[in-house]
């Protein structure tokens, strides 16, 4: 993944990317040796995990291929789905955020404003304190019970560990340790384990293709796609979604900035 590089259009280069080679490529550098395993990604003074649209720093990244296009896949409500997997809780096949918004606002039809607000409510409910009477929602009621049990186990054993790989995070390495922080760290750990497995499958599939996976950021995957290989993005989507278990949103564009 790191060796793929991101192609830079020098005409739109704003000076933030310091290291560009003679082929107009700049490279990422992932560090997975963090507390939760969630990789940082900085190289040459550029934090690729924090490239934003507001300052135009994404505008310079384009396809290296003539008539190529950038594709991005983003998981929908990823941590909520990871929690549901832990709880063996069956979520609806429709939008999770829409489903939760209907319960937050007690309405059958959700407005765009309510939908956007529900995402923030869910974020607070998952990582912080309970709002909007979320304890009355079955999914969050079970989530909070799991969180309490996780906290009790962590205090007893001085650690948390992945139920899938048994990777451990010691409490002594966590500053200001709390029930919510422990839960958040577990989700980051499970997110990373899941994504590394998916990336391995994707790289294996793309081994004989010209197209390249060029950037991974938490729940997002960016690809530089050759014009003759657009159809292969369907298989990439299938690998990521795991038969619909983890739906993704697909965006494409000529620049990293203009994805839609």
How should each PLM-predicted stretch be described?
Residues 87, 112-127:
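Amphipathic, charged-and-aliphatic alpha-helical interface segments
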Residues 129-134, 143-186, 224, 228-260:
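C-terminal polymerase-core module
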Residues 141-143, 217-218:
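Active/binding-pocket-proximal capping segment
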């Amino acid at each position: 993944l790191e060796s793929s590089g991101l192609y830079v259009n020098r005409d739109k280069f704003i000076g933030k990317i310091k290291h560009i080679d003679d082929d107009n490529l700049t490279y990422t550098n992932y560090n997975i040796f963090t507390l939760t395993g969630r990789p940082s990604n900085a190289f040459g003074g550029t934090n690729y995990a924090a490239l934003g649209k507001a300052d135009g720093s994404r505008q310079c990244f384009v396809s290296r291929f003539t008539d190529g296009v950038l594709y991005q896949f983003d998981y929908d409500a990823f941590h909520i789905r990871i929690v549901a997997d832990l709880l063996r809780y069956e979520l609806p096949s429709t939008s999770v955020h829409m489903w939760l918004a209907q319960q937050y606002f007690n309405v059958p039809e959700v407005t765009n404003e309510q939908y956007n607000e529900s995402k923030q409510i869910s974020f607070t409910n998952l990582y912080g304190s309970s709002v909007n009477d979320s304890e009355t929602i079955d999914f969050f009621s079970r989530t909070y019970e799991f969180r309490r049990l996780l906290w009790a186990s962590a205090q007893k054993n001085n650690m948390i560990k992945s139920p899938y790989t048994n990777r451990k995070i010691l409490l002594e390495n966590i500053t200001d340790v709390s029930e919510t922080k422990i839960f958040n760290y577990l989700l980051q750990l499970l997110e990373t384990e899941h994504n590394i497995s998916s990336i391995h499958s994707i790289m294996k599939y793309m081994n004989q293709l010209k197209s390249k996976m060029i950037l991974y950021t938490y729940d997002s995957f960016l690809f530089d796609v050759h014009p003759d290989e657009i159809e292969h993005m369907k298989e990439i989507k299938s690998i990521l979604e795991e038969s619909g278990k983890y739906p993704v949103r697909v965006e494409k564009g000529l620049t990293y900035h203009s994805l839609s």
